[in-house]
Every structure is written in C-alpha cells, then in structure tokens.
C-alpha cells in the first residue's frame, strides 16, 4: 500500500520535498488509497493513523492550520498538534479499539450518524479493513499506528504492505531501541501468548500484544453475554451450550484441544532436514491463509446476537445460527362450509305445523285428491239423471203422535220414511232409530265439523239465504202440492201452527272419518256401519237426495221445512224384492257413495240464526257447509229433537239431562309456569332443546305455555309456543317434547355441525347464563 505523507494534488509533484520537511509539532492529513478513510501522519511521517471524519468533525477536533493542495476527494487538511485527536469520530468502520477516550468518541459517532453530515472521503478500488493499535511512548505524547489485518496485493505491485521490512517503525518503540521484527508464522491457533491489559471497560478488556516488530491490540469480551469478538469465529471455546455442561468438562475439552494443537505445531515447526526453504515458505503461506480465512456466515449452535451488536458491525462476519424457517400459518379450509349453507337453508323447517294442524292439512289434501274423481262422477250422474228421470220434488212432513200407552211405547217410537218408487208408484219404509243413538250421531257430527277451521262470515250469509228460501217455500206450497210425487212420513206434526222449524243439517260422516273420529264413531254408529255393509245400494238411494234437485224444490204442506233426524239400521229396512234392482241401479248412478244423514238442530230462539244449512251434494258445497257449521254460535243436539214443546214435562227433563251429559267442555289457560307429568317445572323464558322431524335437536326459548283441561279438571294437554335460536320462526310443541338446555347439553349437542348451528348454540348458552334464578322468579311472578 502506498502511504504517501501529505500527498499533494495533481500536478504538484514538486511539493513532496516540502511536505517531508514538516516540523514535529505539526499534524498532517494525507491520502491513503484504502477504504473511505483519511490518513494522518505523525511528526516523523512514519506512523499512519486511520481516522475517518467529515468537515464538521474536523473543525471540532481542533483549529485548521492549513489546507494543502488537491481538489475533489483528494483534499488534504492539517490540524494543530495540540488539539485533542481522540475526539475525531469514526463513521463507518468500528474497530475493536478507538483510543483512550472511548465513551466520548462513541457519543460523537452516534450524533454524527444521526446528523448525516457530508464527509470528505478517499476512494480505493479494493477496500482493506484496518485495525487500530496504540503505542505508548516514554511519556512525550501518545502515538497511534495502523496495522493491516489482511494481506492484499495488486497486479502491478503498486501497493505495498505495512508488513514490508522497508517500512521502518523502530522509532515508535521504547527509548532503548527498536524492536526486532519477526513474522507471525510461528504463531498457531491454540498457542499461549502474553498480553498487556490496557483498559477495563465494563464487560470487555482492552489488551495489546507485541510480537517482534508488530503490536496487536484488541478487546476481550465476556462470553457469558452469549456473543464473542467481532468477526472472529469461536474455535478454542466450546459451543454455546456450555451452560448446561459442568465447568470441569469444558476445561478438560479445552486442555485436550490445546495438547493436540501443540503436537501439530511441533510437527509443523520442526521440518525434516531434507526439506528445502521453498517448501517451508509454502507451508507458512498455507498456514497464513488458514488463519486469515474469512469465517463462515453462520455457525450451528451459535446464539442470536443482540440487534445493536449487529448494527455496529457492518461488512463483518458475526457468529450467529442459521436462519430459521418462517412459519406461515396455513389458511384453514373449512370442509363443512357447504354443509353450513345447507343447514342455513334447512333452518326454515319444512314442517312448521304442530300435530293438530298437520292432521288438518293431511285431511284437506285427501279431500283435494277426491275432488277430481268425485266431480267427474257427479257430472256423469247428472247427465244420466236428466236423460231418464224428470225433476223430483220431495216434500217432507213430520208427524208427532202423542202416545199415552206407557213409557215402553214412547221408547220404541221412531220416524218412518216412505220413499216412492219412481217407476211403479210404490214406496219403501225406513224406520228412524232411537233418540239417544241419533244424539250420539249428532254429537259426533258436531265434533267433526268443529275440528275444521272454517269461515264464520260465510256461515252467517248462508243462514240468511236459508231464511229467505224458507219463506219462499211456504208461499209455493199449495201450488206445487199435487204436481210431483211426495215423500210422506207416517207421523204428522200435532201443533201445525208452531213457529218455523230450523233448516236441515246434512252430514256425511264416512267421508271425514280419520284416526281421530273413528274412536268417537264406534259407540254411536255401530248399527250404521252394519247397515252400510249389509245393504249399501238401498241405503244410498233411500237416504241420499238426487243431485238434480234444486234447493227451492224442498217444500212442506203447511209449515215449511220440517226437521227429521234419521239414522239407518239394516234390521229396520223393508224393501220389496221387485224394487231392489231399480234401487241398486239408482244407487250406483248416485253422485256420492257416502251415506247422507239429515239431522235437526234444536233452536233455543224462535229465529233460525243459530242454525246451519247444507243443501247440496257436490263436494264444493260440502266444503261450504263445513264453513257454515263452524260458526261460533252455540248448538244444542238434544236426543228428542223431533218432539214439540207440547211434549210431557218428564220427557223434556230427560232431554235436558241427556243434552248436558253429551256436551264436552274444554278450558284453556295461559300460565307462566307448570309442572310436567314427569315432575319437571317449566317456566316462560326457559332455554330448552326441541326436536322437529327432519332436524337435529335445536335450542329454543319458551314464549308461552298453554294448559287445556276439561270441566271436571282432567288435564288434556300442555303446550308451549317456542322461538328457535338463529331463526325467526316459532312453533307449538308439547311440553313432553322439550328438554332443559344446560342439563341435557352433553347428550344433545352435535360437535360435527358448524355454521348457524354453532351460532344458535352460542346464543342459547349466553341466554341460559343470563337466566338466573332471580330473573326466572321475576318472569313467573304474575300469573296470566
């Protein structure tokens, strides 16, 4: 390396002699082709002191004596000898030792880095790292010297190393004389050397080592802080896991390593006699290359150094572990997302009806299916009747005879219907059953009709129409009396001047038979079923009105429409054998295959506003008749509906008793809490598990509780209206189908379900926690 004292600028070669005659009291700055540094010469231009600075730092260091020649980056400055040289800051390169005033220099370095001041630098093609060293003189002043840490050479040989023996530094030694120069080839890793302790700085020791004509200085750092010297790989010391090992084993390992290295060094130092000096020099060069080989970037087992330690050491190899793999969290793919969407769709139940409404819907569907076939049969029957049969008017007359012969005969009393044979003018006799069986039939009929949800407004309209028709029938009675064939009853009405009787109510119980009303049919209609099985065609014709018959054609001789309560029995039917064939054919041609029963309604008032009229055979009219009969007005079905007010007082009392016994009263009440048959207490606001067919157990909240009882106190049902969590729908369920939420959580909760199910469970759990006993007591404090 060419270190020229006070190197002049371009074109100033003649001034080199003048620069060489500088006085000892003057410090000079010169050019050094190395890293961006500034070279400082001592008074004798022998020692080079590396010091990188900017113009501001140079002014702080001391007064500028002169500015020598040069331009651009080759400007050379001079500073006074008496200035404090250690205050000059080091910018980019941080050597292990920076002089005596270590702390003050470090503070100025940090300040200079933050200010980002422009600096005057000297560039070099291939930078060479430098290490500062301090040489103590006999006391005149402190001198600094520069030592290269690595060997570098140029192709043209323009640069020379400070290791060159031509560079005389003997005058920097002690006052006794110069130190004999010798190389470092004799030093090997693991050998023991004697160093001088210069400074003690917290966890570091500044030491210097003299070897021949060379002086080395460095810092020994405390390894307990988990980091080593700058850029020097740890070879002698064990790995960083030494804390877990005992101290004795570490010392033994280090001793064994030293012994091995000493043996190797002895073999290398004592070459055989036949080895030439050229081979010795080559081996020395190989050893030097091994010692100066740059350490690897990473070391297995080395700790992570502190961040500031890394920041202060640029372009150097620092012992640190290999880079760790960055663990990136993988995005979780929810496999059950599509199922959660399906659950959201399924959350609106396909069957939101309770059991009672579900049965009604099923019955309506069955009727709709029958509409197509029944309507087709009705049209065919009408067409055939119009071709073969003329218009038939039936005039119904009722006759009640007072029989005083005894109670036995009054019990046997029954109405006989005479139906004329259209071809021969003959008729058949049908006996009407007893009063109690008719009352049972009427009660069953009322129950069937009340089970259907019908429109009350339509019922009132039909009742008004029935009144008008009844008045018209009274006017046309005499004119049409002898025009058509008639239907006579053997018993006449005694009190012919009595008020208008209620219109007829036609019921077809076979059509509406289902699971619910089958049980109620058994006690009252056993004879009716037997008659249907025995002579089905005859009963069809005898009890069913023709489809072509108009409502206005129903007439009575004097008192308008008369009431008949009839029920068919197979033992009471008398049909001549010659008429059976015709009756069977007519029965087959009929529009309906069901039995039509005409039932009378006993009125408590003179008007017929509380009565219902069913006067057509078509299916649509039957539906309207259900709506007519489902009004909120009270109906009484006494067994003796055929009797007039002129009957005996004993029979009227019996009728009242029977009618009261046949009435079924049911009372419903909304309560805030109730006890289930299994002993559980359920309150309004409770969180429960509920189940609907096709869905899992789902959390719900009880909104209301309804208890239904008979008039004798017998419990009929306990029902709750619930709202589902995560859904706006509500449902009516029996209390027996509900289970407490918290008590049955483990058995009801399904871990596999996600989405809205989990959301509903979370909401229900929060609501259950908020439902404390105090809140529950407040909710059930008042009965509704």
Curated annotation (Swiss-Prot):
PROSITE patterns: PWWP
Basic and acidic residues: compositionally biased ranges: 399-412
SMART domains: PWWP
InterPro entries: PWWP_dom (IPR000313)
Alphabetized GO MF terms: chromatin binding; histone H3K36me3 reader activity
GO annotation terms (biological process): chromatin remodeling; eye development; head development; neural crest cell differentiation; neural crest cell migration
Top-level taxon: Eukaryota
Subcellular compartments: Nucleus
Keyword terms, alphabetized: Nucleus, Transcription, Transcription regulation
Inactivation phenotype: Embryos exhibit lack of retinal tissue combined with a reduced head size. Defects in neural crest stem cell migration and differentiation seen.
One GO location term (cellular component): chromocenter
Ranges annotated as biased composition (Low complexity): 1-10
Coiled-coil region list: none
Residue span of region Disordered: 1-29, 399-443, 468-570, 609-655
Ranges of biased composition (kind: Polar residues): 433-442
PWWP domain segment(s): 684-744
Described function: H2A.Z-specific chromatin binding protein which plays an important role in the neural crest cell differentiation and/or migration during early development and is essential for the development of the head and eye. Acts as an adapter between distinct nucleosome components (H3K36me3 or H2A.Z) and chromatin-modifying complexes, contributing to the regulation of the levels of histone acetylation at actively transcribed genes.
Name of this chain's protein: PWWP domain-containing protein 2A
Protein's gene: pwwp2a
């Amino acid at each position: 390396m060419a270190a020229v004292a006070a190197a002049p600028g371009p074109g100033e070669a003649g001034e080199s002699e003048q620069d060489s005659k500088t006085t000892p009291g003057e410090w000079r700055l010169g050019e050094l082709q190395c890293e961006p540094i500034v070279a400082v010469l001592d008074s004798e231009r022998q020692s080079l002191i590396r010091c990188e600075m900017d113009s501001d730092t140079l002014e702080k260091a001391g007064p500028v004596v002169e500015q020598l020649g040069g331009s651009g980056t080759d400007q050379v400055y001079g500073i006074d000898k008496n200035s404090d040289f250690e205050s000059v800051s080091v910018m980019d390169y941080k050597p292990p030792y920076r002089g005596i005033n270590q702390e003050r220099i470090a503070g100025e370095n940090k300040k200079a880095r933050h200010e980002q001041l422009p600096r005057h630098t000297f560039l070099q093609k291939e930078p060479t790292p430098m290490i500062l060293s301090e040489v103590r003189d006999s006391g005149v002043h402190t001198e600094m010297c520069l030592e290269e840490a690595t060997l570098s050479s140029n192709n043209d040989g323009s640069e020379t190393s400070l290791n060159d023996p031509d560079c005389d530094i003997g005058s920097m030694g002690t006052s006794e004389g110069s130190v004999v120069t010798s190389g470092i080839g004799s030093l090997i890793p693991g050998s023991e050397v004697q160093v001088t302790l210069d400074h003690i700085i917290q966890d570091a020791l500044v030491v210097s080592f003299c070897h021949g004509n060379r002086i080395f200085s460095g810092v020994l750092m405390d390894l307990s802080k988990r980091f080593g010297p700058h850029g020097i790989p740890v070879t002698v010391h064990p790995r960083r896991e030494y804390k877990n090992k005992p101290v004795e084993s570490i010392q033994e390992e280090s001793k064994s390593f030293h012994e091995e290295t000493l043996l190797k060094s002895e073999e290398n130092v004592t070459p055989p006699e036949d080895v030439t000096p050229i081979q010795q020099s080559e081996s020395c060069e190989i050893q030097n290359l091994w010692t100066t080989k740059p350490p690897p970037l990473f070391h297995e087992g080395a700790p992570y150094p502190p961040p500031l330690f890394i920041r202060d050491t640029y372009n150097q190899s620092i012992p640190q572990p290999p880079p760790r793999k960055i663990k990136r969290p993988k995005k979780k793919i929810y496999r059950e997302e599509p199922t959660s969407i399906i659950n959201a769709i399924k959350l609106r139940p396909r069957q939101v009806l309770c059991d009672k409404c579900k049965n009604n819907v099923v019955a309506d569907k069955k009727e709709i299916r029958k509409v197509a076939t029944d309507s087709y049969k009705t049209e065919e029957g009408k067409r055939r009747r119009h071709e073969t049969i003329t218009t038939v008017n039936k005039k119904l007359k009722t006759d009640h005879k007072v029989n005083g012969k005894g109670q036995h005969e009054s019990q046997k009393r029954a109405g006989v219907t005479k139906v004329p044979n259209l071809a021969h003018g003959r008729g058949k006799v049908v006996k009407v059953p007893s009063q109690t069986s008719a009352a049972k039939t009427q009660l069953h009929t009322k129950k069937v009709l009340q089970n259907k949800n019908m429109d009350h407004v339509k019922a009132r309209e039909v009742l008004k129409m029935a009144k008008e028709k009844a008045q018209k029938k009274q006017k046309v009675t005499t004119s049409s009396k002898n025009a058509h064939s008639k239907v006579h009853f053997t018993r006449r009405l005694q009190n012919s001047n009595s008020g208008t009787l209620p219109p007829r109510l036609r019921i077809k119980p076979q059509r509406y038979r289902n699971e619910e009303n089958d049980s109620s049919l058994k006690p009252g209609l056993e004879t009716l079923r037997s008659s249907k099985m025995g002579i089905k065609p005859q009963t069809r014709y005898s009890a069913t009105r023709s489809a072509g018959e108009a409502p206005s054609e129903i007439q009575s001789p004097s008192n308008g429409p008369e009431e008949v309560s009839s029920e068919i029995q197979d033992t009471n039917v008398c049909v001549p054998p010659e008429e059976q064939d015709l009756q069977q054919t007519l029965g087959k041609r009929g529009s309906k295959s069901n039995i039509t029963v005409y039932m009378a309604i006993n009125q408590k008032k003179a008007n017929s506003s509380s009565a219902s009229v069913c006067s057509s055979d078509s299916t649509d009219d039957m539906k309207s008749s259900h709506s007519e009969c489902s009004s909120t007005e009270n109906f009484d079905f006494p067994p003796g509906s055929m009797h007039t007010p002129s009957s005996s007082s004993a029979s009227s009392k019996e009728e009242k008793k029977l009618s009261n016994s046949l009435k079924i009263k049911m009372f419903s009440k909304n309560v805030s809490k109730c006890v289930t048959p299994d002993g559980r207490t359920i309150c309004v606001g409770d969180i429960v598990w509920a189940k609907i067919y096709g869905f899992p157990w789902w959390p719900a909240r009880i909104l209301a509780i309804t208890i239904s009882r008979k008039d004798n106190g017998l419990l009929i049902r306990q029902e709750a209206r619930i709202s589902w969590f995560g859904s706006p729908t509500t449902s009516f369920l029996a209390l027996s189908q509900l289970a407490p939420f918290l008590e049955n959580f483990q058995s009801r909760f399904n871990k596999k379900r996600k989405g809205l199910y989990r959301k509903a469970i979370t909401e229900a759990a929060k609501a259950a926690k908020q439902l404390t006993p105090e809140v529950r007591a407040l909710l059930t404090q008042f009965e509704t």
